[in-house]
Amino acid sequence: MFGIGIPELLVIFVLILLVFGAKRLPEIGGGLGRAIKNFKKATTEPDEIDVTPSSEKKHKDE
């Protein structure tokens, strides 16, 4: 895993704890989790293509 072991992860966690504080960690974790969930959802869903004609095109034809 990129040469990062448990000691390095603990140091990173402590630094994040010092920077953001204990109160904000759940907010940051929740936001990160939602972002990952939305990214996975966006990559697995097929793209929706809008096939309805636009209203501008109708007005130009008249």
From Swiss-Prot:
Q: How does it sit in the membrane?
A: Single-pass membrane protein
Q: Which GO terms describe its cellular component?
A: TAT protein transport complex
* UniProt name for this protein: Sec-independent protein translocase protein TatA
Q: Which domain of life is it from?
A: Bacteria
Fetch the InterPro entries from UniProt: TatA/B/E (IPR003369), TatA/E (IPR006312)
Query: Which GO BP terms, alphabetically?
Result: protein transport by the Tat complex
Q: Where in the cell is it found?
A: Cell inner membrane
Q: Which organism is it from?
A: Oleidesulfovibrio alaskensis (strain ATCC BAA-1058 / DSM 17464 / G20) (Desulfovibrio alaskensis)
